[in-house]
């Protein structure tokens, strides 16, 4: 295919990374084409109202949080916010547990009231010493001991990654807090909120503010590169795909989602479980660490959105193996996978006039705010390199 038009920047991927870079470059006067193989923008943060009238996150829950005022200020140009205290529970041994691990969890474990000092003493006896944990198993048993590790972490991690925690980097489970007080909030960042009209609406306003962006949906990388002559390429997809899997496919985990909606009597019957009318479960997210349960978690995002609707939708999340042609969600956080990526990183470094940003392009897990920060920094670098565009 011969190129039939030209642009200044060709950006592959219409998620956070691609759209933020495009907005900043367009603001500097450059023409940008953003292409995405999916039929919608927003990447994995895409949300929409389903048939039950419930706003749902189509690719798993996206809990926005950050400690960066700069990132909040930037995104606030395109959205208002609904502040959220994200709550999670775990379901094991036939009951709901407070999670992350805290004093309430300990009381549930021993079946009687306890004080912080009681829990601290118990932890001191239960912990297994690992001064410098080498993997996720060592991280958790050094924090909470073997019993809580097996109850909440081992089975969940095995399902999520199809690898034992001792095969995974220490960072995987090191992200989960453990507290000896009653604080059961999942996250610790100073700003925790959702876009008040959803992520898709936020991205829509970003595009409305940027007439220099030409969004092409349903267009894959090969077609976009063949169709548009460009000065510089920004690639946010999988780095091994960019190189045609020349060195073999990198390992990823994929996901499958099953949504189910409830209303009327079916929803009313759940009040005894959820604790409040209009909801199916007692928290926004419930983890299922039992290895015999095929899904890892059930998410009811209505807890966080605050949407007033006489229905609710739950989404069960099933980890899945990934093969080329499928949807890669998570790079594998393990030494062998990281070593395989380094060979692709060397190829990427040698590419001229190409930027690789985002989770898949750099084969590393990032939160949304980190992706935004990366995109802002790359846009600044590109404007410094190329100067201002001509509009």
Go through the PLM ranges and name each one.
Residues 14, 237-238:
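Glycine-rich, N-terminal phosphate-binding loop of Rossmann-like dinucleotide-binding domains
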Residues 52-126:
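Dinucleotide-binding Rossmann-like beta1-alpha1 core, especially the glycine-rich loop
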Residues 13, 85, 215-219:
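Short loop/edge segments at beta-strand edges and connector loops
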């Amino acid at each position: 295919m011969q190129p039939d038009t030209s642009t200044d920047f060709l950006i592959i991927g219409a998620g956070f990374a691609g759209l933020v870079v495009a907005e900043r470059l367009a603001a500097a006067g450059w023409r940008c084409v953003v292409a995405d193989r999916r039929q919608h923008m927003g990447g994995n943060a895409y949300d929409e109202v389903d048939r039950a009238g419930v706003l749902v996150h189509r690719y798993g829950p996206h809990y926005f949080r950050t400690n960066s005022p700069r990132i909040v200020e930037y995104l606030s140009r395109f959205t208002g916010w609904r502040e959220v205290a994200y709550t999670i529970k775990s379901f094991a041994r036939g009951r709901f547990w407070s999670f992350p691990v805290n004093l309430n969890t300990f009381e549930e474990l021993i079946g009687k009231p306890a004080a912080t000092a009681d829990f601290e003493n118990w932890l001191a006896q239960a912990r297994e010493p690992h001064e410098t944990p080498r993997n996720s198993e060592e991280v958790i048993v050094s924090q909470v001991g073997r019993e809580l590790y097996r109850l909440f972490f081992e089975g969940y991690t095995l399902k999520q990654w199809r690898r034992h925690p001792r095969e995974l980097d220490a960072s995987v489970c090191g992200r989960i807090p453990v507290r000896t007080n009653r604080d059961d909030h999942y996250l610790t960042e100073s700003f925790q909120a959702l876009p008040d009209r959803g992520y898709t609406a936020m991205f829509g306003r970003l595009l409305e503010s940027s007439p220099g962006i030409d969004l092409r949906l349903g267009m894959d990388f090969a077609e976009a590169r063949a169709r548009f002559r460009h000065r510089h390429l920004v690639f946010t997809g999988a780095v091994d795909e960019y190189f045609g899997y020349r060195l073999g496919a990198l390992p990823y985990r994929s996901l499958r989602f099953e949504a189910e909606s409830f209303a009327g009597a079916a929803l009313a019957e759940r009040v005894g479980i959820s604790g409040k009318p209009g909801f199916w479960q007692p928290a926004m997210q419930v983890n299922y660490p039992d290895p015999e349960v095929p899904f890892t978690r059930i998410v009811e995002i209505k807890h966080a959105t605050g949407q007033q609707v006489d229905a609710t939708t739950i989404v069960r999340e099933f980890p899945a193996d990934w093969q080329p042609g499928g949807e890669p969600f998570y790079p594998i956080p393990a030494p062998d996978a990281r070593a395989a990526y380094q060979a692709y990183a060397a190829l990427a470094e040698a590419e001229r006039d190409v930027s690789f940003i985002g989770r898949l392009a750099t084969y590393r897990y990032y939160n949304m705010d980190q992706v935004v920060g990366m995109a802002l920094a790359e846009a600044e670098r590109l404007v410094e390199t190329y100067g201002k565009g001509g509009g």
